Amino acid sequence: MSFEVTIIGSNSAVPAHGRNPSAQVVTISDKLYLIDCGEGTQMRFQHCGIKWSKINQIFISHLHGDHYFGLIGLISTYHLLKRIKPLEIFAPAPLLNIINAQLHVGKTTLCYELIFHPTDSNTSKLIYENDEITVETIILNHRIDCTGFLFREKQKDRKINRDKMQEHNISFDYVPELKKGNDIQLKETGESFSNAELTIDPPQARSYAYCCDTAYDERILHQLKNTDLLYHDCTFDKSGVERAKETFHTTTEQAATMAKKACVQKLLIGHFSAKYSDLNILLEEAKEVFQNTELAIEGITFEIPRIAEKVKVVE
């Protein structure tokens, strides 16, 4: 099953230097999930080759315009294209009033069902689940209500060691219990077997955390622990620590420190200030603290493989 993150937009407040406001697409298996929807997201979909008709869930972190000004356009385009499937939006509660006002002024009644799920920035909770993944909110420290999102792959059942089963002449009727991780006792002979004797560890479940916008805040470290891929606010270089504090954003050193303390596999830095035409200074500073850091360059897809020692970059 694939697990990829495509960067659609990674700049902060305004488009600049060919970079666009925040948006990402997470692809897990054949399902696409949109995180944030800044201005110009639809055009970036076309540039990045995103099959955006397959997006059924949209997650909006907060209501600063660079994270949602592209949303009403996307909602309207789905209507014009006669979308049939329901569209779920997970976002701060006031966004529903904004959407309804825009649709009302335009005298538009959507041809598909829009299901709105208000998020709570004061508590971390499970907000979405299907057969493959869960999505939890992350409490972020910003000027207004803001949540990050943690995508977790569900742990697969243990794999049956068929050779061992046959070696001990064990009926496959015991497979359901073994897959749950339980030990078994054979009804036929009374003989007991530990689960470890008859099963193989499943592949480690993968995870992706999106933390933007936020000030440096170690209270979320427990939730980020051992995440395969972390995207973290990195608006300023290390000299901008006071400006970051004033605006509730993060510097290179702070983002890298979060990654290091959380023991993540890989760090993506983004939400770059428009003051930087060259992002190399940000990358270099972050790598001084956490070596396995990449820039969230638009159009790049980051693949999280089954064995997560390395996160592959797909051009």
Model-based region annotation:
Residues 1-50, 84-86, 149-151, 158, ...:
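Conserved beta-strand hairpin/beta-sheet module of binuclear metal-dependent hydrolase folds
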Residues 8, 122-129:
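Local beta-strand/beta-hairpin segments that build beta-sheet-rich folds
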Residues 5, 36, 45, 62, ...:
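Divalent metal-coordination and catalytic microenvironments
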Residues 39-90, 118-120:
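Active-site metal-binding motif and surrounding structural segment of the metallo-beta-lactamase
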Residues 119, 123, 216-315:
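Binuclear metal-ion centers of metallo-dependent hydrolases, dominated by the metallo-beta-lactamase
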Residues 107-119:
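A glycine-rich helix N-cap at a beta->alpha junction
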Residues 130-210, 214-222, 229:
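Active-site-proximal loop/helix segment associated with metal-binding centers of metalloenzymes
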Residues 35-38, 55-63, 92, 208-214, ...:
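Active-site neighborhood of phospho(di)ester-bond hydrolases with catalytic His/Asp-centered motifs
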